[in-house]
């Protein structure tokens, strides 16, 4: 993992393609261009890059193609990407790592730089008194829940997740 380190988090890019979303992506891609010009470094994504991410075996959420393409270009240019999965995108089952080359983490990521230990965390569920969310998190990450959720068609789960996303 080489410096410089570029850290982004909680972008919540949406699947829909309206002017607002196109403008947000254009700004991000300018940042990516600056990273590529530097020619080296590590991009650390602290979770919730996507507003919703759930993989089926043959299907990933549509509408993210340009984002995935730009992340792949960064990797092809020699930029390492580390992704701490957040509460909106933790249902990655290997696509980001196998198909793009992103190193993914289901929880915190720790590394050393200049004799300092650095911890990157998404932070969801850190509050001990947030009982409701902590219970919800255990349920939606449970393998049985995921198996049941995968029985529904992708369009249904995408629509449901968009509604849930607005409340978290």
Segments from the language model and where they lie:
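Short hydrophobic-aromatic micro-motifs
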Residues: 7-8, 117-121, 128
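Core catalytic region of metal-dependent phosphoesterases/phosphodiesterases
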Residues: 3-4, 8, 13-113
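Acidic, histidine-bearing metal-coordination/catalytic regions of metal-dependent phosphoesterases
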Residues: 1-4, 158
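Contiguous hydrophobic, core-forming segments of folded domains
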Residues: 108, 115, 127-129
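Active-site-proximal loop/helix segment associated with metal-binding centers of metalloenzymes
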Residues: 123-168
């Amino acid at each position: 993992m080489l410096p410089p380190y570029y850290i982004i988090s909680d972008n919540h890019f949406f699947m829909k393609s309206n002017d607002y979303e196109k403008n947000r992506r254009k700004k991000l891609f300018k940042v990516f261009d600056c990273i590529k010009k530097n020619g080296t470094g590590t991009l650390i994504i602290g979770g919730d890059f996507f507003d919703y991410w759930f993989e089926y075996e043959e299907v990933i959420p549509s509408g993210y193609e340009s984002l995935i393409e730009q992340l792949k270009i960064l990797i092809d240019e020699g930029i390492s990407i580390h992704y701490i999965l957040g509460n909106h995108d933790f249902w990655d089952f290997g696509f980001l790592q196998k198909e793009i080359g992103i190193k993914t983490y289901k929880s915190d990521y720790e590394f050393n730089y200049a004799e300092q230990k650095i911890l990157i965390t998404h932070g969801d569920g850190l509050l001990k008194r947030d009982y409701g969310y902590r219970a919800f998190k255990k349920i939606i990450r449970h393998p049985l829940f995921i198996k049941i959720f995968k029985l529904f068609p992708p369009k249904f789960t995408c629509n449901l997740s968009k509604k849930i996303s607005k409340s978290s």
